[in-house]
Amino acid sequence: LSIQDVAALVQPSVVAITTEQMVSTNTWFGGSYVQSGAGSGVIISQDGYIVTCAHVVSGANNITVQLADGTEYTATVVGQDSTSDVAVLKIEATGLTPAVIGDSDSLAVGETTIAVGNPLGTLSNTVTNGIVSALNREVTVQGNDMNLIQTSASISPGNSGGGLFNGQGELIGIVNAKSGSTTNTGEATNAEGLGFAIPINTAM
């Protein structure tokens, strides 16, 4: 399949996620304010189950999911695991287009990868492509040591929770890190062309 074919195939399975969290202000007057966040997710069932990153939805009071066609739904968290940085959301919808789940254990370095997500929280359904740069890369994300797929596909804040697909359009990873992560030697990974994804076999 061409990258164009894969993009057309997988875009309906990727959603944009926006969150609102009530944050208490530690001032003498008390009070609180709403903090907004953004991320991405991947539909894994026709009836509204969506996989994303735990850090995207952690602590959120309100979660809104926007489908590729612009329809918005309120989502609830049905499960999350901060160690693997995976969360599952549920929206009340039917007839959705779930991603085809691939096998991340069969990936090879140099294979084509296509990342689809919502970079910067405003550019929903953005498609970038690259290759598998490395496998089983040890990266610390939000204090957790993880073995991740490294990809050269462009990853930006807001891509977290989006899909990393192979050349056949199968979901092989959940994008979860770019800038602000550190390698196991402690350097910050702000370099371009350096994105990471949770292998789908770990996430599922």
Enumerate the predicted regions with their spans.
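Serine-dependent protease modules
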Residues: 1-204
